Amino acid sequence: LNQPMLDHAAKMQGADDRIAWRQADALALPFTDGEFDAVVCQFGVMFFPDRIAGYGEALRVLQPGGEFHFNVWDQISANEFADVVTQTAAAIFPDDPPQFLARTPHGYYDVGLIEEELRQAGFTQIAITTVAETSTAPSAREPAVAYCQGTPLRNEIEARGGDMLDHVTAQAEAAIAERFGAGPVVGKIRGHVVTAKP
């Protein structure tokens, strides 16, 4: 999270001396050993440059009996809006398809690998639950803009032609509307919720 995001969170939270908003490197947490009874990471571990090291840091700052909770997206084919956007971008750039969504947010979904990496970091009790839900939006426009312009997919699109962002977004909107309808849209989403203990 960048500092403006944390500043916004602090503003929305309101004054509470029990909460400190600060940037930290997940691979080198600025906290003492055993400082927390829980560590929570919402859709973030897939961005760690070294997940085992990040998991090790979570373990280090946990008190005995503490818990590490996180979630990750399942594979992109189980997350319909993201999949449609990725397929649309690939059709526009067939020689060099943007793969951010498939590679990163939806690229760390193998529960066997997740468990193995947690064990390598020192966790011994691991529970992984797969959760399927639906995502809704007022129209096809919202998920198209969210994925194409509100994630690092935007950088990959712009790298292939700075003037292509609006075109890819419009094509993604059309593809979502074609598959899910022109009015309010509902698509399947699926992820894994993980709890790990020492």
PLM regions and their residue ranges:
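Class I SAM-dependent methyltransferase SAM/SAH-binding core
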Residues: 1-32, 38, 52-56
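Non-membrane alpha-helical structural segments and their capping/turn regions in soluble enzymes
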Residues: 3, 48, 52, 79, ...
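Class I S-adenosyl-L-methionine
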Residues: 3-14, 90, 115, 119, ...
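Short conserved AdoMet
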Residues: 14, 49, 63, 123, ...
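A short SAM/SAH-binding and catalytic strip from SAM-dependent methyltransferases
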Residues: 26, 37-52, 72-76
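Conserved Class I S-adenosyl-L-methionine
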Residues: 103-198
